[in-house]
Amino acid sequence: MNDRGDPRSVRAGLADVDGSIDGLVMNAGGMGGKTPMALTADGATYIFAQNVLGHVVLLEALLAEDRLGEVAVFAGSEAARGIPKMGFKRPSFDSNSADELATVIDGSYFAGGKPDVNLAYGQAKLIGILWMAHLARQHPDRRFICMSPGNTTGTQAPNDLALPLRMAAKYVMPRVPGLSHKLDVGAKRLVDGVTDPTLSSGVFYASAANTLKGPAVDQTDIFPDLANQSLQDHANEAIHRLITQKTPA
């Protein structure tokens, strides 16, 4: 067991694993607990560290040691392209620069105002998805799939949401057509990410626009910025500024 928000814990856990890993599913994440915008010892917000930072350390260590067999799957979220009906704005940036993306990681994006935790979650997922697309271009011999499990009932994911949205997620959305599906459906999406050879490396798959269930589709048609290679590279750079400077082994 290790804490995906703590790079040192991830490295220690990986040292205990022998051999290669045929398929890696990076599903840990969430809304950052009770203090999502507080900073970890590494200088990242808890919500970013929980959703992205440890996964970066884990996957890139496996790649560096040539221990990833074939495929890595990162659990994305429709929040990365916006969920207006649930109060998640689509992430957007003024410059798309590494400097600007780095402000998401350290929380200074919201300096001088009240943080929007829903937006911060979508931003974190988006940066993780862009990083995976960057890796897909660097490692064409392996598959890097981003897959949202969709709005899945029966998990602990809503526990960190604000009370009104938490109550809606637990008791209202499961009864509204088009807003959620059962746990086994969400789990199957992640399994498909590992096993379905028709899924394209570097692509983010999630529910169609304006829904949170149903078939998983390529999100690039909904949010073209996902295919922006410069933005992908800037996301990778922003992440590694923190990892290189603040997370020694």
Write out the residue ranges for each language-model feature.
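Short, flexible, mixed-charge acidic loops at enzyme active sites
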Residues: F88-P91, N159-R166, A209-N210
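Short aromatic-enriched loop/helix-cap "lid" or pocket-rim segments at secondary-structure transitions
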Residues: P84-F88, Q156-L161, A216-T220
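Short C-terminal domain-edge/linker segments immediately following a structured domain
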Residues: G54-V57, A102-S108, P174-H181, A235-A238
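Rossmann-fold NAD(P)H-dependent dehydrogenase/reductase core
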Residues: M1-T153, T244-P248
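C-terminal helical subdomain
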Residues: Y171-T220, Q229-S230, E237-Q245
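A structural signal for well-ordered alpha-helical segments within the folded catalytic domains
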Residues: L53-V56, L126-L130, D184-K188, D233, ...
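Alpha-helical membrane-targeting segments
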Residues: Y109-D116, N151-V185
